Each structure stands twice: as C-alpha cells, then as structure tokens.
C-alpha cells in the first residue's frame, strides 16, 4: 500500500503494518498494561501488629462495665491499626512482544484509516525556538500533535517541550499510549520506514 507524503512522492509501506484490521480488545489490553506499569504502588498502612505500642491490656477483663479490650491498637480503636492495611505492590502486567507489535500495528492502521497520520519528507527547526515550531505547525494546520522523527532532534524536542498538546519523539520513544493520546501524528518518511522495520 502507499502513504501520501506532503510535498513529496508517495511512500510504499507494508499493508501488514499500516493496513491491518483494528483489534480493539488487544489495544485496550496493552494500553491498560502501560497505565498499570506507570503506577508507583508505594502506598503503605500499618496493621494492628505494626502500630507502635498497645502491649499492655488497657483495663482488666471483667468488672469495669466497659467492653473487653486487649490492646489499644485494635482496628476498632482510634489510633489503632488498619484492618486490611494496604501494602506496597507491583501493578505491572506482562505484555508479550507479539501483543505489543500487534497493538502498535492496529493503532497505526487506524490512524491511517482515520486520516490522522500525516507523513512529511522532513520536519525540523533550525533553532530550539517554540515560536518557530508554532509557525511550522500553523502552516500544516496542526495543534494537537505527536511529532515522530527518525533520529533524536534536540532542537525540535526543546521547541516542543513547552507547548500544550504537542510532543516530539524519535521512533524509539513512541508507544501505544503516546500514539492514541494526540489528535494527529506527524511522521517523517524516515520515521515511517524505521517503524516498519521495528514492527516487522
């Protein structure tokens, strides 16, 4: 299949990567796994055995008229432990390479179908100036966009860093979450070829 390139000849790409049927369940599973992996999972509370103090019985078992109590750190008490205390845990989920590649291909194919993937021959800024990048994006009528280049472009990265709903990455920096987070994805022809090789 062919991808239209702005200001250049069409680019021949693999249908297996850019013309695949959308697998919603797979994309959902991979995106959820990414979100789960981003969780810190460092929350912690203390159970009755971990709260400091509470060794002595507060009052004798019988004869006071009060409810019996064995420790002041019971979960029923104020300053007591937590009944089912939260502990640090790893929320990450395993994503197989085949699943990851399948999700990426599904997303890229859907971007092509929805005409949200824009391919240009080359895209860069001469200096790390946000103003320069804004002008370039205005020319292309883009405001909510992920810019993907073949190589790391320091100037482009610095120019995009302070812009709302604009991000610049190289091919190694893209993932399923970043591809669906923006309204449009702007890729250089070089980046398209690299993505194709990466997902082959």
Curated annotation (Swiss-Prot):
Q: Which UniProt keywords apply?
A: Ribonucleoprotein, Ribosomal protein, RNA-binding, rRNA-binding
Q: Where is this region: Disordered?
A: 42-65
Q: Which GO terms describe its molecular function?
A: rRNA binding; structural constituent of ribosome
Which InterPro entries does the UniProt record give?
Ribosomal_uL4, Ribosomal_uL4-like, Ribosomal_uL4_dom_sf
User: Would the keyword Transmembrane helix be found if you checked this record's keyword annotation?
Assistant: no
Keyword rRNA-binding listed: yes
Pfam families from the UniProt entry: Ribosomal_L4
Q: Which GO terms describe its biological process?
A: translation
Q: Which GO terms describe its cellular component?
A: ribonucleoprotein complex; ribosome
Instruction: Give the family from UniProt.
Output: Belongs to the universal ribosomal protein uL4 family.
State how it assembles: Part of the 50S ribosomal subunit.
Per the entry, what this protein does is: One of the primary rRNA binding proteins, this protein initially binds near the 5'-end of the 23S rRNA. It is important during the early stages of 50S assembly. It makes multiple contacts with different domains of the 23S rRNA in the assembled 50S subunit and ribosome.
Protein name as it appears in the record:
Large ribosomal subunit protein uL4
The organism of origin for this protein: Vibrio vulnificus (strain YJ016)
**Species lineage, top-down?**
Bacteria, Pseudomonadati, Pseudomonadota, Gammaproteobacteria, Vibrionales
| Gene it is expressed from | rplD
């Amino acid at each position: 299949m062919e991808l239209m390139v702005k200001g250049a000849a069409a680019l021949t790409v693999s249908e297996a990567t850019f013309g695949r049927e959308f697998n919603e369940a797979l994309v959902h599973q991979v995106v959820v796994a990414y979100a789960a992996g981003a969780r810190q999972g460092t929350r912690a509370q203390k159970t009755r055995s971990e709260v400091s103090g509470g060794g002595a019985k507060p009052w004798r078992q019988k004869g006071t008229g009060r409810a019996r109590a064995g420790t002041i750190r019971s979960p029923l008490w104020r300053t007591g432990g937590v009944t089912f205390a939260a502990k640090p845990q790893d929320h990450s989920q395993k994503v197989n390479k085949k699943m990851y590649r399948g999700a990426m291909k599904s997303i890229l194919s859907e971007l092509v179908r929805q005409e949200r993937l824009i391919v240009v021959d080359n895209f860069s800024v001469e200096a790390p100036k946000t103003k320069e990048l804004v002008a370039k994006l205005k020319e292309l009528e883009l405001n909510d966009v992920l810019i993907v280049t073949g190589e790391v472009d320091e100037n482009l990265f610095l120019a995009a860093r302070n812009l709302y709903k604009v991000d610049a990455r190289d091919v190694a920096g893209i993932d399923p979450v970043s591809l669906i987070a923006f309204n449009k994805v702007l890729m250089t022809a070089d980046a398209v070829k690299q993505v194709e090789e990466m997902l082959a």
